[in-house]
Design a protein with these regions (language model features):
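Fe(II)/2-oxoglutarate oxygenase catalytic core
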Residues: 1-156, 164-188
Length: 188
C-alpha cells in the first residue's frame, strides 16, 4: 500500500497582529495584578502562572480588543488553509482568554500534549497562541512535525488542537519570562 503525504499541517503564524506597545501594556497589566494569578502545576506535565482575563473587569477592554484581532485572523486562517464555509462551523465561540507567564526558573514549561483529550475539551477546534515578548527559548514545538515556532512579540500561532498536533511549550533559557495569551475556538 502506498500513500502520498500532502504536507498540509494547518499550522500558521501571523506576525505583527498587535503592536509591541500593546504587548508591553498587557505584560505590565499582568504583573500589576498578582492577586489574580492562578499558578498551574502538574508534575511532569505543566508549570506556569496564568490569569483568566474575562474573570476580571480590568481586563475587559483588552479582551474586547483581542477578540476583534482574533476574528480577523480566523478569516485569514480560513483563506490560507483553503477552508470553505462548508468546512467551518457557522457559529462558534471563544474559550476564556488566558494570559500565561512562563518564568526562566528551570521548571516552567508545558510538556508534549494535545489540547483535546476528553469529552469536555472536544468542543475545541482551533488554537490561538499570541506571543507578547521575545525571550530566549520558550519555543512552541511540534515534535512529530519538526516545527518549532519562536516567540515574537505580536506573533499569533494558530493550529488544530486534536491528536494530530502534539505540541509543547519549551522552557525559557534566558533571563526573561515568556508571556502569551491563549484561547480556542469552540463548537457551539
Amino acid at each position: 500500500m502506498q500513500f502520498e503525504s500532502l504536507n498540509e499541517n494547518y499550522i500558521r503564524t501571523y506576525d505583527d497582529i498587535i503592536t509591541k506597545d500593546l504587548c508591553d501594556e498587557l505584560i505590565s497589566e499582568f504583573e500589576r495584578n498578582e492577586s489574580q494569578f492562578d499558578k498551574q502545576v502538574l508534575k511532569d506535565h505543566r508549570s506556569f502562572t496564568q490569569i483568566a482575563l474575562q474573570q476580571h473587569s480590568n481586563w475587559k477592554p483588552y479582551a474586547d480588543e483581542l477578540q476583534g484581532v482574533f476574528n480577523k485572523c480566523v478569516w485569514r486562517y480560513m483563506q490560507d488553509c483553503q477552508v470553505t464555509d462548508k468546512m467551518f462551523p457557522p457559529q462558534y465561540a471563544y474559550e476564556m482568554y488566558r494570559m500565561k507567564r512562563y518564568e526562566p526558573n528551570g521548571v516552567d514549561e508545558f510538556h508534549d500534549h494535545v489540547d483535546v483529550g476528553n469529552h469536555e475539551s472536544a468542543k475545541r477546534f482551533l488554537v490561538f497562541f499570541l506571543y507578547l515578548n521575545e525571550p530566549q527559548g520558550g519555543e512552541t514545538d511540534f515534535p512529530q512535525r519538526g516545527i518549532s515556532v519562536i516567540p515574537k512579540a505580536g506573533r499569533l500561532l494558530m493550529f488544530p488542537p486534536m491528536w494530530t498536533h502534539l505540541h509543547a511549550g519549551r522552557k525559557v533559557t534566558g533571563d526573561t519570562s515568556k508571556y502569551i495569551v491563549g484561547s480556542y475556538l469552540h463548537y457551539i
